[in-house]
Amino acid sequence: MARVTNHAAQRTKERLGISKRIADKNADKALQMGIKHSDTSGSLHRYISSLYWKQQAANNVRIYCDNVYIFHNDTLITVFPLPQKYRKTTSKIKKGRKS
């Protein structure tokens, strides 16, 4: 079960428009079903790597519903939207997983 920091709850409300209670459920889904760093390649992989190095406490970065979730173990630190240029790549990765 993912935990959500106060900062992450504030950011999910601000950036995604969802409440704290729903943010907990959303963080769980992102942790379980989100695209992992190891699933990516190319420029998306480099982008996720740069986020990993910028966030000192981060050790788990996931992409879920066109948003980037930064975790430390199972604690959500922050969330922000995925840049538009990477969204096609993530949809291809999702389709490849289902097959």
Residue ranges of predicted features:
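Ribonuclease/tRNase effector modules and their secretory precursors
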Residues: 1-99
